[in-house]
Amino acid sequence: MGISRKRPVFLSADWHNLLFANYTVTPSLLEPLVPDGTQLDLWNGSCFISLVAFQFRNTRVLRMPALMNRDFEEINLRFYVKRALANGDVRRGVVFIKEIVPSRLIAWVARTLYGENYVALNMAHEIQNDHEGPRMVSYSCGEKGPCNRFSATVPTASLIPGPTTLESYITEHYWGYSETGAKGTVEYEVEHPQWPVHQVSEYNIDFDFQSLYDARYAFLSESSPTSVFFCTGSDVTVRWGTKV
């Protein structure tokens, strides 16, 4: 029997009601943020950045229920990279530009242990389920109140995306990468099953990307995403990171 090389589990949770808005951008926007040892991962020659909003539920740290904030929202801005291994394999992963949560404690833990750019803001969400019709999903955040909003009407129909689709590219990056100063690049594994996708045509994105992220992303406030879709989600496991 072979010995598992997987790292120990750091965090497990349910990720639910995920909204994705995916924008085509020029690679030069993201190249300064690419962690050492990785490179941008393109889809059909195009570079993407994604706004993702979802719910954490039943959060467990080191296999123990979180004492506080087991259920909360997250909104993140992310892009996609890959790392070539010596044996020829390729690991496809995500780099987070900024992750917004409603708790200062959660933000501190994530910054300290993973070097991720987490911040705490006021947040809210609303999920309206209609078992016979569309689902209404809304997330919002802001400094003085939830003034930035991402909402959508989600149809009931869903499908498993094919391996070469944009939806598969967006949802099936199973590694995370961050640069933590003197520690260099940290790589961690994220495990979840393949998610069925609901295509979304009715949505509203009212975000001040400049104030939330940086002036370089201000153009996204006036841009239309290439695609918007929804995933119900699943249980997710995040393993301890390691320097690469």
Feature map (PLM): residue ranges:
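Interaction-surface and assembly-scaffold signal
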Residues: 116-244
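Short beta-strand element of the conserved SAM-dependent methyltransferase core
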Residues: 21-23, 79, 202
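Feature targets compositionally biased, intrinsically disordered low-complexity regions
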Residues: 44, 87, 92, 180-183
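Aromatic- and glycine-enriched beta-alpha-beta binding-site module
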Residues: 60-144
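Aromatic-enriched hydrophobic runs in primary sequence
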Residues: 9-10, 30, 54-56, 66-79, ...
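Generic structural motif
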Residues: 26-28, 54-59, 82-86, 102, ...
